[in-house]
Amino acid sequence: MAVNVYSTSVTSENLSRHDMLAWVNDSLHLNYTKIEQLCSGAAYCQFMDMLFPGCVHLRKVKFQAKLEHEYIHNFKVLQAAFKKMGVDKIIPVEKLVKGKFQDNFEFIQWFKKFFDANYDGKDYNPLLARQGQDVAPPPNPGDQIFNKSKKLIGTAVPQRTSPTGPKNMQTSGRLSNVAPPCILRKNPPSARNGGHEADAQILELNQQLLDLKLTVDGLEKERDFYFSKLRDIELICQEHESENSPVISGIIGILYATEEGFAPPEDDEIEEHQQEDQDEY
């Protein structure tokens, strides 16, 4: 069972945000650049696996989580581990998944003290434990791309390059049919080179189209996730509608309020997405 830590006061023992990030990255072999990126909950799940082997089913952890309902799923896994090990700590899930600095910094400060009180110094291979999966930081286009590129300059991390690997391989394959890259740089521009530049541009546009499709699919799942919750609330309200409660009436009024051009998803579509989510779990 775990040793509980109840102190939440700020003391000289608390690490700065930079030191805290360094500890997280060094311990789990990550490349987080902001405290806010802990909002996915994946890092905490693996820390629990490090402290108490077997208390977390890492296969259930969504290491590539990018949407809020996926963060919530990870924190549910963490809550189950807390309960299993007798950790008396209420996880402020609703605050953490919003990705605000202060909420996440306060929680990681507590968790660091909890970790120090329970860690026995045994060896742990985080990459092996998560089967080589990379813990993807929550989407932040400006910082994420820049920091990822900077990391690749000095560190060879195969899984970091996987999202763009196929695109680069295809482009390299096309260019190699003409001449090595060094020769292409020496030759003056020509119509032949222009054709390959057009091919590279087409590949880039296709990749952008794929990225947009994945984004839309994720947003649709998130929409249906919250819509299903509203349907559950609607059913509860309908069961008690005969009580003439002003609270129930107010909730129903909010549920049925619409704006021009709004169209709720069809029931079949919601059930299909819900089945896909269950299959992922």
Swiss-Prot record:
Its main location: cytoplasm. GO terms for cellular component: cytoplasm; cytoplasmic microtubule; microtubule; microtubule cytoskeleton; microtubule organizing center; microtubule plus-end; midbody; mitotic spindle astral microtubule end. InterPro entries: CH_dom, CH_dom_sf, EB1_C, EB1_C_sf, MAPRE. Keywords: Cell cycle, Cell division, Cytoplasm, Cytoskeleton, Microtubule, Mitosis, Phosphoprotein. Residues 217-260 are annotated as: APC-binding. Residues 14-116 form the Calponin-homology (CH) domain. One of its GO terms (biological process) is spindle assembly. The keyword Transport does not apply. Residues 157-181, 260-281 are annotated as: Disordered. Belongs to the MAPRE family. Homodimer. Heterodimer with MAPRE1. Binds monomeric and polymerized GTP-bound tubulin. Interacts with DCTN1. Binds to the C-terminal domain of APC. Interacts (via C-terminus) with CLIP1. Interacts with SLAIN2 and SLAIN1. Interacts with APC2. Interacts with SRCIN1. Interacts with AKAP9. Interacts with PDE4DIP; this interaction, which is PDE4DIP isoform-specific, is required for its recruitment to the Golgi apparatus. This is Microtubule-associated protein RP/EB family member 3.
